[in-house]
Amino acid sequence: MKLKVPPILLLLPALMLLVLVSCGGASQVADTPIQKVQAVGKPAETQRHDKVFSRYPCTEDGTKPFTSPFFPTDLITEILPMGKVSATSGHVTPTDHLYVHRDVPAGADIEYVLAPADGAIVHIQRFNQDKLLDRENQSSPMVPDYRLIFMHSCTFFTIFIHLGELAPAVAEKTGEIPFGDSWLSNKSVPIQVKAGEPIAKFGQLGNDWSVHDANSTLAGFVVPEHYDGWEPWKIHTVDPFQFYDEPLKSDLLSKVVRKVEPRAGKIDYDVEGTIAGNWFMEGTVDYSGNVDPGAPRYWNGHLSIAYGYIDPSQVRIAIGFDTGIDDDLYCRVCNGAYGVRGNEPDPMTVGPESRLVKYELMSRRDEGFEHAIREQLGTTSLGTFLV
């Protein structure tokens, strides 16, 4: 993000001073560039590639209506909106996906995640290890952990993360995918799937879901080029519920814990001339952190000054590097994302003319299991953030 004076992309001492006084003392893996190959059966002169990743051969543009639930709605317990921040999981900047939760299956795990619309599976990535179906139960069975990219058109994609066992028709075409490896349609043939057909088991008790439209670019990323090459889909993230008709749309929205618009959440908070939005530490270049794809903690140089993903009245400051604040002792639910005393001043009102502005970082409420409660301010002062 860029300020008029100076660029907000960088954490410059002249603009920002971070002072953290301690009271006591997981990520989405991005696609890596691969060589483009000619579409099967297509002459080179007519070959087209998608407009999000610039890698997958395709033939048509445009969105498609979602005619199938991606999972039985009666088995979905809740949907968390986009925009959550957690330095512990690598999401210092607001997440571009929703979190879909279910209960532990009663009996055999037989339900599959389904294609919401016609399209083709073009990329499946297997993470480095299998996971417990129920991470709270050490005797729970292990399930695979996949990230899957589903292309509906040259401009329209659905992405699922943390899916389980692949559907038989899909696994037959991919073969065994080793840990830490990927199946790519560029090196094979895209797997065509019709709306309502199975893709994979749900996986654990929560997975990630996002939809991206190359013809839509979020206005709240004032320098969209900073995401190119690392997470190019991010600036094209859209509300997935808009593609469903009733009654399915309302069925899904009834599971969403955010009750204010936009119900699907918000991820783009950059406002030029203010401190609001995503920041990248000087020398880290952009979202990539100036490290190789797959390198650990690329988000160390990330900072976001935004708002609560469930309750946008809550100011939220998320910091990628180790601040010295002991979250385990003082704020177990913070994970590097802190509240602000009084939720003021509003970051959208703070700019170069504001001089030195003090934010008192606060804990968040750590009680019960409701996400909305954990988004509210706690009572412990954790440090001082000076802008």
Describe the residue ranges of each PLM region.
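Bacterial N-terminal signal peptides that target proteins for export
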Residues: 2-12
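Short hydrophobic beta/alpha edge segments that flank linear recognition/processing sites
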Residues: 136-139, 145-150, 190-213
